Amino acid sequence: MKILIDFFPILLFFGAYKAYDIYIGTGVLMAATLIQMGLIYTLDRKLTVMHKITLALILVFGTLTLVLHDERFIKWKPTVLYAAMAIGLALAVWVWKKNFLKLLLGSQMELPDPVWMRLNMVWVVYCVFMSLINAYVAAYYSTEAWVNFKLWGYAFPLVFIVAQGFYISRYLKTDEPKA
């Protein structure tokens, strides 16, 4: 159910774009994201900071796209989101000496501090990469190619997270008694 809720807006955006155009797709994306956040809030009784930032960016860039009738705004939303994540994760470590990943996930798993630091840096690099690749596709390819990239590009985070799972599993402490 959670995966369906996560992919609900992008699937509707893709369908609306294919059936109509980028502007109808953008309106559908905005409405679907509002519904998505309502569902998440109803189920979890909270929205994470990431949910709030994503919602704000979709509404701001979507509104600019629709009001100015300029598709470049919605195409740049992922670039801005990933760049903001990279900057936030990097500044947290280098300026405030805080590891946001550890703060967010530390209660769910116990890992050595160097592992948390490597994970944080890998996320910074990943977010920079995703920001740059989206900027490149948005700037140099057609809108149709960008929309297809957005839909099929969801494989990038899935592969990235699975790879992290394998990396993390080596460091997770188990409660099993040693023989």
From Swiss-Prot:
Entry keyword set: Cell inner membrane, Cell membrane, Membrane, Transmembrane, Transmembrane helix
Q: Which GO terms describe its cellular component?
A: plasma membrane
Any idea where this protein resides? Cell inner membrane
Q: Where does it primarily localize?
A: membrane
List, alphabetically, the InterPro entries matched: YciB
Q: How does it sit in the membrane?
A: Multi-pass membrane protein
General function of this protein: Plays a role in cell envelope biogenesis, maintenance of cell envelope integrity and membrane homeostasis.
The entry's family comment says: Belongs to the YciB family.
Name the chain's protein: Inner membrane-spanning protein YciB
**From which lineage does this chain's organism come?**
Bacteria, Pseudomonadati, Pseudomonadota, Betaproteobacteria, Burkholderiales
